[in-house]
Amino acid sequence: MSDPTRTPIGATLSVDPEWGRTARAWGIFAGIAFAIATAAFVVEATGLLASSPAYTPTAAGQLIDEAKFFAASFGYQQQVLWDYVLRDGLYFFAYLALIPLAIGLREVAGHRRVAPQLAAAFLVVAANFGCMNAFMTFVQVDYWKNSGWDQVPAAIMVAVGRDVDLMNGLTRWAGIASFAALAIALYYLGRACRSGGVLPGWLGVVAYVGAAILLAMIVVSQVSGTDAINNLLSLAIGMVVAPIVTIGLGVHIARAASGAPEPVDGR
C-alpha cells in the first residue's frame, strides 16, 4: 500500500504534527457552531419566536405605509435580536474555522495535487464571504437594538428603513457568494477524496451532496414563495453536511499529520 504522505515523485512530505491538534479542534468547533447557528436560523425563519410584519397598503399613502412597516420590522428584529446575535456570531467564527482547515488540507494532501489545493483555495474564499455576511448583519443590529422607531417622523423612518434594506441586500448576496464558493470547494474536496490518499471516500460522497444542496439553495433563493424549501435545505446543509465535513476533515487531517514525518531544519 502506498504511503499517503509521499508525493508522486516519491519525496517524503514534512508536516508539522501540531496540525493534528489544530485541525481536529477547528473541525469540531466548526461543526458544532454551524449546527447551532443553523438551528437558530431555522427557528427564527419559521416564525417560532415571533411573527414578522407584512407590508400592507392603506389609504394613508405609501410614505406612511412604508414608515409603519419599517417601524414594525425594526420592532420585530429587536424582539428576536438575541437570535441574530447568537447565530451570526457563531456563523462568523464557524466560517473563520474553515481557514485553518483549508491550510491543513493543503499541508497534508495538497502538494502537487490540483483538487486539494483548489478545495483549500475556495474554502478560504467561502470563509471570507461568510464572515462578511455575518459582519454586515451586525451592522444592522446597531439599528435594531434601539427602540422608539414608531415615534420617528415618517420621512426619516422610510430613509433609515431603505438604508437597512440596502444593507440587508448586500448581506444576502454575500451569503449567496459564500454558498457558491463553498459549493465549488466541496466539489473539489470530493474529487480529492476520490483520488485516495489521506481522505476517505465517504467524505467525498458527503462533499458532493453538500455541493448539490448549496447549488439548490442558490437557485431557490431567487424564487419567491420557497421559504419552506430553503429552510429544509438549510437544515440539511447546516446540521448534517457541514458538521460531517468539517469534523471529518479535521479528524483526517489530524491523522495524516500525526503519521507524517516532522519538518526538518524549519522546512
Region annotations inferred by a language model:
Residues 2-267:
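Hydrophobic, aromatic-enriched alpha-helical segments typical of multi-pass transmembrane helices
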